[in-house]
UniProtKB/Swiss-Prot annotation:
Belongs to the MurB family. This is UDP-N-acetylenolpyruvoylglucosamine reductase. It comes from the Bacteria. The lineage of its organism: Bacteria, Pseudomonadati, Thermodesulfobacteriota, Desulfuromonadia, Geobacterales. It comes from Geobacter metallireducens (strain ATCC 53774 / DSM 7210 / GS-15). Cell wall formation. One of its GO terms (cellular component) is cytosol. Its EC number is 1.3.1.98. The gene is murB. Pfam families: FAD_binding_4, MurB_C.
């Protein structure tokens, strides 16, 4: 089946197609088994063609962003992993609005907004990854959240391009709920006019804060757990005494207790075991069950 699917992918798509691709190459944690196929569609039309082919053949798939909030288990991923990296268009619109594709990096997006004097999403400068990934998890920092600036979300579902205004979205702290099979391809954002120098100063301040508080020095996925209501996950972890705790090559960062880092040679199983140890300790001490902020996928 994989040989037949590979032949059709190569014949019917224009984007890059990789076979038996180690997901450790595509995640910031640098762990994860191989995907049967790793496909980067050339554009929206290519993505539409790919989804039609996968539906026809009954092939499972998983969409990924920049891999910064993703933990892939050591058994890898069956079917097709879809990268939206080539959906990287940015278009300036009237009225302080910008359309950004899902594959645009947060850094690129923030730089464009700064240069054009458009404020409101400066906090994205310290969040690695892509606009699509930021939307999918409603990324936020410094009191801001990305979906709050969305005017219209662009998605594809069942081969149809959809446009949904923010009032029609179901979202909250670190989540944006989509229909099964619905894929984010971009969004139109409404920003505020602002002086580019003031925007740049805010960006510099956010980056300075990030460097001071999150300089961990090893591969990581950012905050591993969501903050429970009314408190911070890092504080709960720190109070258990697990800062610096290690399982195999995975370790609780000495610099930030909610960052789990790859000290070298870590496996996904190491991270999962360490996360379980943390959660058990926090629950025993406080009664709180921590919820992972990272997305955990793949086979054992």
């Amino acid at each position: 089946m994989n040989d037949e699917l590979y032949a059709r992918l190569r014949a019917e798509l224009r984007g890059e197609i990789l076979r038996d691709e180690p997901m450790a190459r595509h995640t910031s944690l640098k762990v994860g088994g191989a995907a049967d196929f790793f496909v980067t569609p050339a554009d929206r039309d290519d993505l539409t063609a790919l989804l039609a082919l996968l539906a026809e053949t009954g092939t499972p798939y998983l969409v990924v962003g920049g891999g910064y909030n993703l933990l892939v288990r050591d058994g890898g991923i069956r079917g097709v992993v879809i990268s939206l990296a080539r959906l990287d268009e940015m278009t300036l619109l009237a009225g302080e609005r910008v359309m950004a594709g899902a594959g645009v990096t947060n850094r690129q997006f923030v730089q464009l907004l700064r240069d054009r004097g458009l404020g409101g999403l400066e906090f994205l400068c310290g969040i690695p990854g892509t606009v699509g990934g930021a939307l999918a998890m409603n990324a936020g920092a410094h009191g801001g959240a990305v979906v709050d600036r969305v005017e219209e979300l662009l998605t594809i579902r069942d081969g149809e391009m959809l446009q949904t205004g923010r009032d029609g979205l179901d979202y909250g702290y670190r989540f944006l709920r989509l229909a099964p099979g619905e894929i984010i391809v971009g969004a139109t954002f409404r920003l505020d006019p602002a002086d580019p120098d003031q925007i740049g100063a805010r960006i510099a301040g956010y980056l300075e804060h990030r460097a001071a508080s999150q300089k961990v020095g090893f591969p990581n996925a950012g905050s591993f757990f969501k903050n429970p209501e009314g408190t911070a996950a890092w504080r709960l972890i720190d109070e258990t005494g697990l800062r610096g705790e290690r399982v195999g090559g995975a370790q609780v960062s000495e610099a930030h207790a909610n960052f789990l880092i790859n000290r070298g040679g870590a496996t996904a199983a190491d991270f999962l075991a360490l996360a379980t140890r943390i959660n058990e300790a926090v629950k025993q001490r406080t009664g709180i069950t921590l919820e992972e902020e990272v997305r955990i996928v793949g086979e054992e």
